[in-house]
Structure formats: C-alpha cells, structure tokens
C-alpha cells in the first residue's frame, strides 16, 4: 500500500484502535504467563478528561504496552467511581434548575434522578481515554456502585463491624455546611487566611471591682456555645481567676474558670474560651471536665435556636454583626490582624465547621500497624521514595476514620434500627430481619418494623477495596482471578490521594488478602502551565485534551506529556512539547518512507562504510535498549523516552541513514537493507509504548502481516541482542567529532558539499578503520597522516589529535581574512566584558559559585577561540 507523503494522525489512530478492539488484543484471562496488572485510579463517573488524567493514563498505558511486548499477560482494568459528594451535588443542582428541591423527594425518587444522571453522563471519560490510545481491557469495566462492588462493600462493613473495628458514636467531626455531610480529616484542606484576633471581655461574676478577663479568639460568633473559661495553673498573671466564674459577653451565661496546662500561656492573654461543641480541642477539655456542649449551628451553617441570639443568620454574617454589638456594649477590648490556617472542604471549598455529630467510625490503628512496615522496608516501593516520609507521618499519627456521610447517593450503611432501640448490622434486609428477631426475641417482627440508617458510606470506603473487588476477592476469596492477578504490579496515581486511597488500599489488602495490593506505586507530579501555575478552569490555563489530540495527534500529545514529566516532579506543560511530538512523528514517517523507497540491488556488495555503520548501530541500539530497560525499572519514563528519541533522531536518522544511503538513482545491497529493516523494527518496538499509533501503522507496512489473525506490533515480542562493542561505539564518537568539524569548515568557508576535500591527520590516526565512513560523509579525496599541516589549512582538535583540511585556492583569502578579523574583534570585545566582570570584587564576593564558574568558562572559551583565530589569520597572510 502506498504510504502518504505526510503523516496524518486522523488516518491512522481510529483505524488501529478499532483493529486492536476487534481482535481483543487488550483482553486478558489467567494463563501460564507472568501477569502484569494495573488497576486504573477510577475517575469520577460524571467527570471529563483533563490534563491530570492525560498524564496519569499515558503513563499507565506506556507501562502496560511495554509489559505486553515483554511477553507478560498484561491486564489493565478500567472503571469509574460513584463520587458521592460530587455527583450528588451535580444532581441537586440539576434538580434545582428544574425547580425541584432534594427535600421534596423521597430517597428512592432522588436516587432515580441520580442513576439517570449517571447513565447519561457516566463513562464519557472512559470513551475519551480511547482517543488517547488507552489499552484497557474494556470488558472488565467496573463501577464502584455496580452489583459486584456493592456486595463487596457491604460484606466488608459487616465483617469489620463484627470484628469490633467499626463503631457508632457522637464525636467531633468536620462538617461541610454546603454538602450537609460529615467529612474525614483527609477531606479537609487547610489554607492560610488573613483575619482578625478579637479580644473579648468576660466580666468576673460578683467581683466588687468590676474586673474582667480578656479572651483572644478568631471566632467571636461561637461565644453562644461557651461553657467554661480555661487558664493554665502555672500562669501567674491569671492566678487571680482561679475558682472564679465569668459571664459570657452578650449571652450573660455564667461559666466556671477551669485550670489545665493545655492552655498556651503565651497565646493572647492566656485565657481560653471553651466551646466543646465547636472546637476539637475544646471538645477534649469538655470530655475531661464534664462540661455541657451547646451546638449553636444548624447543619447549613446558620445559627440555631440553641444559640439564643442571631438565630437563622449565617455564621460569617454573625461574625461581622457581633463585632459591632460587642463594641457597642463595651465588651470588645481590641482587634488585631491575625494569620491562621482555616479548614476547607476539599469537595465544596467552603469553610468546614467542627461539629458534634452521631457518625460511624472505623478504628485505624489496627490497619496502620500492618500497613506501615512494608512501605518503610521497601517491600512495597514508592517512586519517588520521598513520599515514604509523608506516608510514615500519616500512619504514625493515624486517627479513626469517619466513614458515614449524610448523603443519599452511595452505599447505604447496612445498619437497621429496632423499634425498641438499638440496631443490627447485616449485608441484606433479610439477614437484618433474622438478626433483629434473634436480638429482640420477637419472632413477629417484619421489615416494616426496621428502619435502615439513612446515611451512606464515604466514597473511599468502596474505592479502598478496588484492587480486590475488581477480581471479586471479597465475595469469592481465593478465586482464580484474585489468585492470578493479585497483588497487582504497579499503581500510578497522584500524591494528593496518598492518604485517601493509596494507604487505605494497602491497609485493606493486608486485612483481606494478607499481602500488599501492588508491588510499586508511581506518584505523578501536578500538571502546571509553563509559568508554573497549577492548571485550572478558573485560571483558563488548562487546554482541552481532546482538542490537543485533534491538533497534534495522540502520539504527539503523549510524547509532549512525557517529555515534560520527570519522575514524580511537577510537569511544566507547554503546547510546544506536543508540537515537538508531532514533528517527531513526521521524522519517523519520513525516515520510513526514505528506507522503503530504496531499491535493493542483489548484484552489489555492502560497502566498507555500510559494514562499519551496521556494526556501530547494532551496538548503539543494544546499548540504548539496555539503558531504556534500566530506566523503566526505575520508573524514569521521561528519560527512557528521551533516550529512544535521541537514538532515532540523532543516531539512526542523522548518522546511520546518512552513512548507508545509496547515491541518487542507485540501489542498496541486500545485507545492509535487511539490517536496516531489522533496526527499524527494533526502533518501532522501543517507541511503541510511547507512540502506539504511528508505530503500529509503520510496522504493519514493513512486511505483509496477517490481519485476519490480528497480528500486531502491540503483542510482538520485544527481543533484542545484549551484545555491545563498547570500544567500537566509543571510537565512533571520535569519528562523529571529526565529521562534524569538517562539516563546520565547509559551512564557515562556504565550500559546497560536491567539492572534494583532503584531510590531514597529524601524528597518528586513532580512527583509521573508519576512514571509509569519514570519506563518504565528508566527500574526501584522501585521508593522510602527516608530520605538519599544510600552509593555510583549517585545523581542529578531536581529543588529543589534530586534524587539518588544506584549503588551497578554495577560498577567497582576502574575504576570509576580513571575516575572521571581524570575528576576532567581536570575540576580543566579548572577552573584555567577561574580564571586567571577573575583576569586579563585589561580583566575585556575591555571585554564586555556579555563576562564577560559568563566567570563567566563558573566559577560557573566548581565549581559546581568539588564539585559534589569530593563528588562522597569520597562516592565511603567509599563504
């Protein structure tokens, strides 16, 4: 088939993706091969592809495709997450646009709307991943709320409850007033804010002098919930308050002064207002001293009846109003500018409210004890390893996980309340009824007598089971698939969910499988724009990935992403990198067309230059292939791509093909041509994981392939020789230096390539065996070893050997002298500038060492060039 003159991704990508699907080349079933398994970090079911997904899934696809070519049984499992908070918020907004409130609907009615929304918008992102070339086993596509996953979640909840690890109780939680649900500690993001510190006057009850204590607080709106004041017993300045009672400003509630060394003597005035219902630390003091708790907030962040004042007003409006009212009452001593960290909901970006609430919790210490050692001793490896410390810190400071959410979209908690109080926990209503009858001794109970908990589970409670539940390891422990595919091989994810997801998967993996869920974790960086800003919709600096693919092709975008993605570091993404990727596609395409355009002539033998070229490139390719394998083993994928890129662009295209290219209108010998096709095949294998579409197209074009059998580069073995003639490769670097210098002389002296030159080697020729290559590449008449160079010759050094090119009458001597004198003048001026800088004592004393070293190198380079120019000018003037 005739190959188009230009590479057009649109002609290639859809065609080959469909071919791979039709021949089920992404499919995996347990067999005798070594498994290679990756589970996709499930994106939100209603999400759309963004640059972070592009990076993450490009990396996963590279790893999976490489494993396939290594002969492993590669299984990449896709799926989506039900994303309770995000999805419910979208459904609520959609209903609101139709004039419907969530509170107007029954749970079942709301869930019908949620399922409709999910079916309409769900899975879009997985379809978009196909455009990227993602080679997932789509038959295995899972959803965290599908039947199999739901059964797994409920079974685990019941099991952990029966083990005494899940409990229900009133605790201080992070409350999201917008989503109207509790959050885990990991779902709270702390942001630095510039606010005020309010100094409030608490009058001492019955004090004849009318004295008062002053309390510093950032939250004056919570004084309605104050039930004590606390001082440090070792604080002399507040000792006069011991045993006293004070009056809460505006509220006029009398509260005791208690003593505890928890109070920081240096903060504010050393007096602390204690609000047990709305501060985590105050809650602990309340528990310790048996203080009452007054919850002054409604779930939506407005003040409740219990507050007594400002009822129904928003908490932040109250803060503004209470400042005025306190000041008017003479109860505000002063305010100061103050910077502190405020907790925000990760999902809704509103300030969270610490709140006492009845919730379900999972005890975490048991899990942390199992999950910390394997990471710290590198049984389970993190790339980059710096994230081990982040992981350790969290594990060593673990807190119980609040797993209940006041939402309807999600896995409903399988707890059923009994008519006379108490509850039972069971995976199904039928089991719950049987347990209820047994617990109450009332055989007449029916399902109508039981009331299931309204709350649902934290989304992460389903996704922590992902590597196990995808292979049905919870419902059917020890089945063929879980035994074969688990533990999975690699996890590719962002460090922002190391606690939410990575750590918890490790925990539950040891709990239910007795081993880690994956062998390696590769943490990607954050995708930023070229100015270093995080990509976001609000900044408008995040390109549409699908538009990038349409413009540059999937291979171009994949390559652009990976060129910008050093392992574990943030990615400074620039469209120019995708353009570089597209240009590389064109380079590959044109090199292929060049080779396939040659005519094989069986009547000619390989030239000496071609034999040397083949021997060199075979070693060079094997050397780079070994380097790439080593880089893959260290997850340095960007460097691996760059190594293959340079091998193809520089070594293969710029050097090898130039060395073997037949003269215009002539044929090429069969031996060299066969070797070249073999090299090209190897290069396509090395490039395929990074650039699957163009490599498949060209591989299919190389020879007649069996399309009916689904023959494909994707499942073609990556097998390369390991032999490297190291000395030969090193010598060839010298040869390249010689050729490059001769080419520079032609360029500088404006001598056409068709004009043959002579080369003189002074002393001894260290690369004499490569003379045929040098002669061909530089169009040389001869290479001779001499004791001294010809008058007027242009010379250069490669290593310790001097080479000279006699120019004779090839140049206009006067013009060349004028050119070199102009260059000499420029270089001398440049050198003076450098010397002036280096003679400046202030610069020498203050400049970083690297800058000084750079300036000294500039000096040395300029002096060397000046010396060479003077010598050349003198030689020309003599001639």
From Swiss-Prot:
Pfam families linked to this entry: Anticodon_1 (PF08264), tRNA-synt_1 (PF00133), Val_tRNA-synt_C (PF10458)
Main location as per UniProt: cytoplasm
Gene3D superfamilies, per the entry: HUPs, Isoleucyl-tRNA Synthetase, Domain 1, Valyl-tRNA synthetase, C-terminal domain, Valyl/Leucyl/Isoleucyl-tRNA synthetase, editing domain
Keyword Coiled coil set for record: yes
Keywords of this entry: Aminoacyl-tRNA synthetase, ATP-binding, Coiled coil, Cytoplasm, Ligase, Nucleotide-binding, Protein biosynthesis
One cellular-component annotation, GO: cytosol
GO biological process: valyl-tRNA aminoacylation
Subcellular location per the Swiss-Prot or TrEMBL entry: Cytoplasm
Residue numbers binding ATP: 537
Protein's UniProt keywords contain ATP-binding: yes
GO molecular-function term, one example from the UniProt record: aminoacyl-tRNA deacylase activity
SUPFAM superfamilies: Anticodon-binding domain of a subclass of class I aminoacyl-tRNA synthetases, Nucleotidylyl transferase, tRNA-binding arm, ValRS/IleRS/LeuRS editing domain
Catalytic activity: tRNA(Val) + L-valine + ATP = L-valyl-tRNA(Val) + AMP + diphosphate
Entry EC number(s): 6.1.1.9
Motif ('HIGH' region): 43-53
Motif 'KMSKS' region, chain ranges: 534-538
Sections of the chain in a coiled coil: 807-878
Role played: Catalyzes the attachment of valine to tRNA(Val). As ValRS can inadvertently accommodate and process structurally similar amino acids such as threonine, to avoid such errors, it has a 'posttransfer' editing activity that hydrolyzes mischarged Thr-tRNA(Val) in a tRNA-dependent manner.
Subunit structure: Monomer.
Entry comment, domain topic: ValRS has two distinct active sites: one for aminoacylation and one for editing. The misactivated threonine is translocated from the active site to the editing site. The C-terminal coiled-coil domain is crucial for aminoacylation activity.
Protein family per UniProt: Belongs to the class-I aminoacyl-tRNA synthetase family. ValS type 1 subfamily.
HAMAP family, sorted: Val_tRNA_synth_type1
The protein's name in its UniProt record: Valine--tRNA ligase
Name of the coding gene: valS
């Amino acid at each position: 088939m005739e190959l188009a003159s230009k590479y057009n991704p649109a002609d290639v990508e859809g065609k080959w993706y469909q071919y791979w699907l039709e021949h089920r080349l992404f499919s995996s079933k347990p067999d005798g091969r070594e498994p290679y398994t990756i589970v996709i970090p499930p994106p939100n079911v209603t999400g759309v592809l963004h640059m972070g997904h592009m990076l993450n899934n490009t990396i996963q696809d590279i790893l999976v495709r490489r494993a396939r070519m290594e002969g492993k049984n590669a299984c990449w499992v896709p799926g989506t997450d039900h994303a309770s908070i995000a999805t419910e918020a979208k459904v609520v907004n959609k209903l609101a646009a139709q004039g419907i409130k969530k509170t107007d609907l029954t749970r079942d009615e709301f869930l019908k709307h949620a399922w409709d929304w999910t079916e309409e918008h769900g899975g879009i992102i997985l379809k978009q991943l196909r455009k990227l070339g993602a080679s997932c086993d789509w038959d295995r596509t899972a959803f965290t709320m599908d039947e199999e996953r739901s059964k797994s979640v409920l079974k685990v909840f019941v099991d952990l409850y029966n083990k005494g690890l899940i409990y229900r109780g009133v605790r201080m939680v992070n409350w999201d007033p917008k989503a109207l649900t509790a959050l885990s500690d990991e779902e709270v993001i702390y942001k630095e804010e510039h606010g005020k510190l309010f100094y409030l006057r608490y009058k001492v009850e019955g004090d004849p002098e009318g004295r008062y204590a002053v309390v510093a607080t950032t939250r004056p709106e919570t004084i309605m919930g104050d039930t004590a004041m606390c001082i440090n017993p070792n604080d002399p300045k507040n000792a006069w308050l011991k045993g006293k009672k004070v009056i809460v400003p505006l509220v006029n509630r009398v509260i005791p002064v208690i003593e505890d060394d928890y109070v920081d003597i240096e903060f504010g005035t050393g007096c602390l207002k204690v609000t047990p219902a709305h501060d985590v630390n105050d809650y602990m003091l309340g528990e310790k001293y048996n203080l009452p708790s007054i919850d002054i907030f409604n779930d939506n962040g407005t003040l409740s009846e219990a507050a007594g004042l400002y009822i129904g007003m928003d908490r932040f409006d109250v803060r503004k109003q209470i400042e005025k009212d306190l000041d008017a009452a003479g109860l505000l001593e002063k305010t100061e500018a103050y910077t502190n960290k405020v907790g925000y909901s990760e999902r809704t970006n509103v300030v969270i409210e610490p709140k006492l609430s009845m919730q379900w919790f999972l005890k975490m210490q048991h899990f942390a004890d199992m999950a910390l050692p394997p990471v710290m001793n590198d049984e389970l490896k993190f790339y980059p390893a710096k994230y081990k410390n982040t992981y350790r810190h969290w594990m060593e400071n673990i807190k119980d996980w609040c797993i209940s959410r006041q939402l309807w979209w999600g896995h409903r908690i399988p707890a059923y309340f009994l008519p006379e109080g108490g509850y039972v926990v069971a995976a199904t209503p039928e089991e719950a009824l049987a347990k209820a009858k047994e617990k109450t001794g009332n055989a007449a109970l029916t399902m109508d007598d039981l009331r299931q908990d309204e709350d649902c589970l934290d989304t992460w409670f389903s996704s922590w089971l992902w590597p196990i539940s995808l292979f049905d390891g919870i419902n059917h422990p020890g089945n063929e698939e879980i035994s074969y595919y688990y533990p999975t091989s690699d996890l590719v994810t962002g460090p922002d969910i190391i606690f939410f997801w990575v750590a918890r998967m490790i925990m539950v993996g040891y709990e239910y499988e007795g081993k880690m869920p994956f062998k390696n974790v590769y943490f990607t960086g954050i995708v930023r724009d070229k100015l270093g800003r995080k990509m976001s919709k609000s900044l408008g600096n995040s390109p549409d990935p699908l538009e990038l693919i349409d413009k540059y092709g999937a291979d171009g975008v994949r390559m652009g992403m990976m060129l910008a993605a050093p392992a574990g570091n943030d990615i400074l993404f620039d469209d120019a990198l995708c353009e570089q990727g597209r240009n590389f596609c064109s380079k590959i395409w044109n090199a292929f067309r060049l080779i396939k355009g040659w005519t094989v002539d069986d009547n000619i033998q390989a030239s000496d230059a071609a034999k040397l070229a083949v021997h060199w490139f075979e070693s060079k390719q094997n050397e780079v292939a070994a380097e790439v394998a080593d880089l893959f083993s260290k997850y340095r994928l960007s460097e691996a791509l760059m190594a293959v890129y340079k091998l193809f662009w520089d070594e293969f295209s710029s050097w090898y093909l130039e060395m073997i290219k037949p003269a215009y209108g002539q044929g090429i010998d069969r031996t060299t041509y066969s070797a070249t096709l073999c090299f090209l095949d190897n290069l396509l294998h090395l490039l395929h994981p990074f650039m699957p579409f163009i490599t498949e197209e060209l591989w299919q074009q190389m020879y007649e392939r069996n399309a009916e059998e689904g023959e494909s580069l994707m499942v073609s073995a990556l097998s390369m020789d390991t032999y490297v003639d190291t000395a030969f490769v090193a010598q060839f670097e010298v040869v390249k230096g010689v050729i490059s210098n001769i080419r520079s002389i032609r360029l500088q002296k404006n001598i056409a390539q068709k004009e043959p030159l002579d080369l003189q080697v002074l002393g001894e020729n260290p690369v004499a065996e490569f003379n045929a290559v040098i002669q061909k590449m530089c169009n040389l008449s001869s290479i001779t070893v001499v004791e001294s160079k010809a008058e007027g010759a242009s010379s250069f050094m490669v290593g310790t050997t001097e080479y000279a090119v006699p120019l004779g009458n090839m140049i206009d001597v006067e013009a060349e002298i004028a050119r070199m004198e102009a260059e000499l003048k420029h270089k001398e001026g440049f050198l003076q500038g450098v010397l002036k800088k280096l003679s400046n004592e202030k610069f020498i004393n203050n400049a970083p060492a690297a800058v000084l070293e750079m300036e000294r190198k500039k000096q040395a380079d300029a002096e060397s060039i000046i010396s060479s120019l003077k010598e050349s000018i003198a030689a020309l003037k003599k001639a």
